[in-house]
Amino acid sequence: MGFVRTLALALSVGLLAVPLATAAGNDSPTATKRVVRAWSSRLNAYDNAGAAQLFAHPAVFVQGGSALRLETSAQIALWHRLLPCAGRIVSITVEGELATAVFRLANGRHRRCDAPGQKAAAVFRVRHGKILAWVQVPVPPPASSGPTA
C-alpha cells in the first residue's frame, strides 16, 4: 500500500486528528533528521522505552494495512518491542514535517529479523521534536542522477 493511500486511510478513520502544519510550523530538516536518527539508534539498542519517549501522545502507527492509535508511552514501547528487525539508515529525505527513511534491515540485540539485508522504509511525521506518526511505506526508487540517453 503506497504512502498516499496509507495516509488517506489514516485520515479517513480519524487517526490523524491534528491538522497538517503549515510550512512555517515545521521543524528544520536537520532537526527532523535528528529525531529519526535518535529513533533508529534507540530501536537498534533495544531501548524501547527510550524510543517511545520520542513520540507524541497519541501517536499513529500504520504497518501492513493496519493502523493503530497508541495513547501511552507503555503502549508505544510495547509496539517497538514487537518489531522484528533492527536496521541501519541508508537515507533520510524531508519534506515539511514528513521524513522518509530507508533502512537496511538486520538482526539486533533481542531481535531476530525476518528479512536481514533487505531494505525497508518508513515515513515519520515530526512536529516540535516529537513523532506524531510512523507509517511503513514501500522503499522509494533511487533518485535518478538526471536524464539518460
Model-identified regions with their sequence ranges:
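Hydrophobic pocket/interface hotspot
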Residues: 39, 50-52, 59, 75-76, ...
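Short beta-strand edge/turn micro-motifs at domain boundaries
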Residues: 100, 117-149
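Residues that flank catalytic or metal-binding motifs in active/ligand-binding sites
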Residues: 55-57, 85-88, 120, 127-130
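Surface-exposed, charged secondary-structure patches
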Residues: 73-116, 123
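A short gly/proline-enriched turn/hairpin at secondary-structure junctions
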Residues: 54, 59-69
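Short, low-complexity N-terminal intrinsically disordered segments enriched in polar/charged residues
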Residues: 11-48, 53, 57, 143-148
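Bacterial N-terminal signal peptides that target proteins for export
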Residues: 1-8
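Short beta-strand segments enriched in hydrophobic/aromatic residues
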Residues: 55, 105-107, 138
